[in-house]
A protein has these predicted regions:
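Generic beta-strand/beta-sheet core signal
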Residues: 24-26, 62-64, 95-97, 149, ...
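Structural beta-strand/beta-sheet cores of well-ordered domains, especially the beta-sheet scaffolds
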Residues: 19-21, 59, 90-93, 142-144, ...
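Terminal RNA-binding accessory module
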Residues: 107-170
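AMP-binding (ANL) adenylation modules
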Residues: 96-101, 136-137
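Conserved non-cysteine loop/helix-boundary elements of the Radical SAM core domain that shape
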Residues: 1-91, 102-116
Length: 170
């Protein structure tokens, strides 16, 4: 993971940086992370995201998650869902695992049936929607700098929220 405490400190203290982080969780089960050959643990990821949230309460923290990786058990999936529900993440991108020719994962045993992968992806997307709604609600009433888009009726804040701007207010 290429986000160090020094980077968190820099973003927290320098106003030229947008308070938006995108960190590749991939999974919350250490067994699955090991199978994916990820060089970090869920404990490291949790500590990093909690550090960001404590330093920058309004920061956006997004992540990518893969469901259905070969060998992902029901317990592994429950670990992922449970972590996400209580995580400080503001949004997630969910990817159902699919074989890619020539990759180590494509030759692994323990393939998860497609219907199960699709159901797990739906469940995690639902959790992701709840995370986004919680983050948006936490931003209600706050003021942020934003970059207007197109005709000025839409904008993106530094913490990655898309907002509508009333006519004449841009």
């Amino acid at each position: 993971m290429d986000c160090s405490p020094d980077i968190v400190d820099l973003v927290a203290t320098e106003p030229c940086f947008a308070p938006h982080f995108h960190l590749p969780l991939q999974h919350a089960s250490n067994a699955v992370l090991t199978a994916m050959r990820r060089p970090y643990t869920i404990e490291y990821f949790r500590a990093l995201t909690l550090s960001i949230r404590s330093r920058m309460p309004h920061a956006s923290i997004g992540s990518d998650v893969i469901v259905g990786f070969p060998g992902e058990s029901d317990d592994d999936f429950a670990c992922l869902a449970g972590y996400l529900e209580s995580s400080p993440l503001s949004h997630i991108h969910v990817f159902p695992y699919s074989d890619r020719p020539g990759t180590a994962a494509s030759t692994m045993n323990g393939k998860v049936p497609g219907a199960v992968v699709r159901e797990r992806a739906r469940t995690i997307r639902d959790i992701g929607q709840q995370l986004l709604e919680r983050f948006r609600e936490g931003q209600r009433g706050t003021v942020h700098r934003a970059l207007t888009l197109d005709d000025g009726s839409l904008a993106v804040t530094g913490n990655y929220l898309k907002v509508r701007i009333p006519p004449g207010r841009a």
